Each structure stands twice: as C-alpha cells, then as structure tokens.
Amino acid sequence: MRYALLAASIFALSAHAHADTLVDNIKGETIATDGSLQTFSALLFDDGGTIKAVYGPGARLPKQGRNGYQYHIDGKGRVLLPGMIDAHAHVIQTGFALLTLDLSDTVSLDDALDRIGKFARAHPDRPWIIGSGWSQDRWHMGRLPTAAELDRVVPDRPVWLERADFHAGWANSAALKAAGVTAATVSPQGGAIDRLPDHQPAGVLIDHAADMVARAVPITKARDLDLALATAEADFARRGITAVADMGTSLGDWMAFRRAGDGNHLYMRIMAYAMGTEAMAAIGGSGPTPWLYADRLRMGGVQLLLDGALGSRGAWLKLPYSDQSGTSGTPLWSETQLGNLMSRAAMDGYQVAVDAIGDKANATLLTTINDLTHTYSGDRRWRIEQAQVTDPANWGLVAEIARTGGVVASMQPAHQISDRVMAEVRLGPDRLRGADAWNSLKHEGAVLAFGSDTPVERPDPWTGIAAALTRQDDAGAPTGGWQPQERVDRLTALTGYTSAAAWAGFAETKFGRIAPGLRADFILVDTDPMTATPEAIRKTKVFQTWVGGGKTYDAEPEPVAAKSGTKH
C-alpha cells in the first residue's frame, strides 16, 4: 500500500508535456560546452521532453498559439539550474535506509541501544532487525561495539546493523549463530572478524567478512525492492536530483529499475554500475545495455571495491595507521586480481569504476589503469571512486592517464566534513596533504564528478557544493577550512554536480546541461550557487524538479489551472 501511494503521488506530478512548453521569468544558469557559465532567461522544450531552444537575456521569445508554444511555465523569477546529478549513490540502499532503523544521528552507544530496543519493540513481527548508520567514532568509544551489548536490548532474534560507511556490520549473538560465525570461523580474504580475547567473534565483521552475516538475512522480496526504489526516488526529487550513478547495482536492483520503467514510474535517470563482473555479465551480457525508457536507465559500467573504509581501518595504506600500528588496512583484491577484473570489463566495452580509499589502494589503482591503457586505448574515462587518501608522489600518474584514456575523480565533498576528525587520528599529520585532494587532482587533469555515497551521507547536493567551496561543516568549522588549498571554485562545484557528473557516465549527449537537443531536466530553486554565501547555499530550497519535461516534485503544489495554456 505504501509503495502504491508513493508511486501515485509522484505520478500525479509527473504528467508529460503535450506540445511545446515555454519556461520564462527565470534566472537561468548552466554549464556551456566550453566549461564556462552560460546564463539565459527562458527555455523551450517539446512534448518528448527534449529542449528545443534556450533564450538569452533580451532575446525575442516565441508566441503562444498554433504556430508557437502551447504551454507556459512562469518561473516566478527563481533560479533555474540543470537537474543535480549524484555521481556516486546507492539507490536501493538509500530507500531501505529510509525505511529501516536509522542510527546516523545517534550520539553515543547508549543512545543507539535505546533506539534499537524501541525499534524492535515497535516491530515484533520482523524476523530480523535491520538497520544502518552507526559509527563508533561518532560515539567517541575508542573501540567497536559488541554482540553482547546488542543482546541486552534484542536477545530474541537476529540483529544486523551496517556501519555508516557500509564496510562493516554489527551483529548480535542470534545473527552470528544464524550465519554460522564461531571462534573456528576463518576471516575471508579481504575481510576481518573482530574477536574477543578467547577468539570468539565480538560482533563486528568488516568488509568481506560482513558478507557471511548478510547472506543469512532473509532474501529481499521484489515488492520490498520496489518500495525502496519509490522511496529513494521521492527523496532524490525533493532535493533537486534528477540523475544518479548507481554504484554496485545488483541483478535484483536492476530488475526493480526495469519494473519501474516498464510501469512508467521510473522518475529519475540511473546510470548503473554493476557490482562486480558477475553481476555485469548477468545484466549486460557481452556489453553495456542501450539507454532505456527515454534515456532513464542504462548499465554501462562495473564497480569494483579495492579496499575498505578509513573509519573501520579497512582502507589500504602505504604505512600503518597512526592510531593502530599493527595494521595498514585490507586490500580486497591482489594487484593481479584487480588487473584481471578490470581487463575483463574493459575488453567488453564496459566503463570501469573502482573504489579506492587509502593511499596504497589509490597508488595501486593508478598503476593498474596506466598499464591497461596500453591495451585498452581510446576514451575510457577510468573512474576512481572516493580517492579519499592519495599520495602526492602518485599524482603524476593522474596526469598521464588523463592524456590517454581520461580519468574521473568521483568524490564526495560531504565525506570531508564527516570524516575530518577521524581522518586526522587515523592518518596523522604527514598524510593529510593528500586527503580529499579535489583541487590537486583537478589540476593534474582529472575530471571532478561530485556525489554523496548515499546512504553513507545524505544525498544533499547543496551541502556538497558548500563543502566543496569552503571545506567547512555546517557550523563553519574549522576556521579557514580543512586543508584549504583543496577548495574548488564555484564553477567547478556546480560543474561537478551537473555536466561533469553526466560526462563521467558517458551521458553528456543526453543530459547534464540546459541546451538544445538535451533532455529537459531542470530545477527551480531560491538560491544562486554562483553568488550566494555558502551558508545560503546549504539552505537552498528546491521549489520544483523536472525530468524529461515532467514535474517530479513540487514544494508548492497548486490546483491544475482551468486554462490549458498554463502549467504548474
């Protein structure tokens, strides 16, 4: 029922255009083909949702009528921008995070346990308690939580809670038992089981070890995936996001996207990157899929994970962690395995996107890409996802790859805000110069595509733009910005969430800018990101979101006008 209501509410807003529609009385801004800022005062799109014309200030507009446009949208003097694009998102996980137990705002272990207990009591019919968003760093614990602590509030059924970075999970004793994880269980390659002094599993499983519990969770039903997608779509639309790069698309995710498209309720554009080469082959077969549903869905690439997260000390570093000298992190693949997987995808024409967090992971990935460019030439647009900690000594490889097959630094400005204090502890002062090095990587020739990694962070492009400009959190800390030399300018920030994010997914001929021939994906907002203060940008209000000439979100819905020539 909830899915039906969500779908119906969006469908009511998403009526398609019938004949040409003029949007005027706007302050329009978009990125031009040469990368500069282009301003305009009106645009015209057709009944297929494609932009026909863009009019500069003072230009003569067409007339309404039989030989002109039929419908009119009054922009009310608001700012019109291309729809925002989240260059690194997890669509279905975002929906589930909104539907299940959310621990992202808990401030202590006791706070989390209280929330977990209340949630379990409120849902006595759920065979498992599922949730996400916890972080021992945010709780200032200095250690990982345990199964015994979970057992105190939910002793009667399994509990599985993924960490905020989704690179670790916290299980109670019932979940460990259901998964068969015992003192005798060996940690898999690319994973680790946190253990008690007697070698019993303590409760947290990291990276590939977490898969053991995840596989024991009851299989998600198709209707649950559909509800998660509809929930995520509504959340993206209200934030002004019209397209995403969905990283780690499973076959089940893909089928949910296809069901939505077949049912005419896929209300945003999804550039899908399959989770590993097996899912890639299952979805696309011998090559990327074509664009489907009027350019709303395509699987054109594969996502591979090279290491774990910095917060759970899974990120692969060149030197040991500053706060735990016994480990340098966990590579999930050997260098040979990584090269083979990337080659397997590249030979069939798939775009390759690899998550690399630590400086050793990034150095290994850059070397591997550079080697592969000799075999796989042409416009490849190799994607480095996260690129959280890089070694300046390796930046020269970025420039070399940029000259050959092209390289995308797909980065998440909000991570810098939430991870700053933790990164200082994990890395120590000597490695911070290469942390979230947006400006330096851009200078070396990488194309910056910005996203959120939702549900790890909120899919809020306005927080991301403000963070990219200032390297400060919402409270303005730290003064002057963290590693301020890595701040980017306003044009780069806006480009990162629009045209560059489209280019990063080989979609620049479809959407990402306001230009004739591209899809009419746009938003009306109250704030101009090219002139407003960072504080104002963070508070940006989205009034309307349009995808392919159809409205998918309206903050101020009005009754349909009696005159056929007016659109709301």
List each language-model region with its residue ranges.
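Gram-negative bacterial Sec-dependent N-terminal signal peptides
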Residues: 1-17
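Acidic (Asp/Glu)-rich catalytic clusters
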Residues: 261-264, 288-294, 374-377, 398-406
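Distinct, well-ordered alpha-helical segments
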Residues: 255-259, 282-288, 362-374, 397-398
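Divalent metal-binding segments
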Residues: 21-25, 30, 35-285, 300, ...
